[in-house]
């Protein structure tokens, strides 16, 4: 029995031919999925590019639920758009320890934009949440977002996109938490 898939994409190479083949198989068998963009610490990595490729090349509704903090060798954390906070990994522990902090000042506007897009997208799959979104977007809770997101993923309407670096254990625990 297969309940769901984690699709792994390279932050440098993006969607590759084998990704397309496996994606079509998952579509045929109606398997819900989540995307993990790996190798964010590599030169030439680009989370946004990969998310756009997943949308365009695979015809999916890829929705970012995180934003990267730092690029390439300076990749050090993520902004969790659901909880509206940042996670910064400790280099010396190879990502096994981290700090939860406020969103860095230079990412606040971008985080607000992408959180709004995330809420708008999941609200379109939940009538109660859509009504609340129209009245007061700020009053929507983490639990409401998670519930609507889960329903949309199970209906294969949304593909949540996460980024990290598996080699350095950055984003792996976040991915595991997202799957559960």
What does each of the following model-derived ranges do?
Residues 2:
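An anion/phosphate-binding loop that grips the pyrophosphate of nucleotide cofactors and donors
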Residues 10-180:
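P-loop NTPase catalytic nucleotide-binding module
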């Amino acid at each position: 029995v297969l309940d769901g898939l984690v699709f792994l994409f390279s932050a440098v190479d993006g969607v590759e031919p084998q990704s397309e083949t496996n994606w079509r198989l998952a579509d045929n068998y109606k398997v819900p999925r989540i995307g993990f963009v790996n190798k964010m610490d590599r030169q030439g990595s680009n989370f946004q590019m990969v998310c756009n490729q997943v949308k365009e090349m695979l015809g999916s509704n890829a929705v970012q639920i995180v934003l990267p903090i730092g690029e390439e060798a300076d990749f050090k954390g993520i902004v969790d758009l659901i909880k509206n906070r940042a996670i910064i990994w400790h280099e010396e522990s190879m990502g096994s320890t981290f700090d939860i902090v406020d969103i860095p000042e230079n990412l606040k506007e971008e985080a607000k934009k992408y959180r709004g897009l995330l809420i708008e997208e999941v609200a379109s799959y939940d009538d109660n949440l859509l009504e609340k979104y129209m009245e007061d977007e700020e009053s929507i809770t983490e639990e409401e977002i998670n519930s609507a997101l889960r329903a949309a993923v199970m209906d294969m309407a949304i593909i949540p996109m996460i980024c990290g670096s598996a080699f350095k254990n950055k984003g792996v625990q976040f991915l595991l938490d997202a799957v559960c």
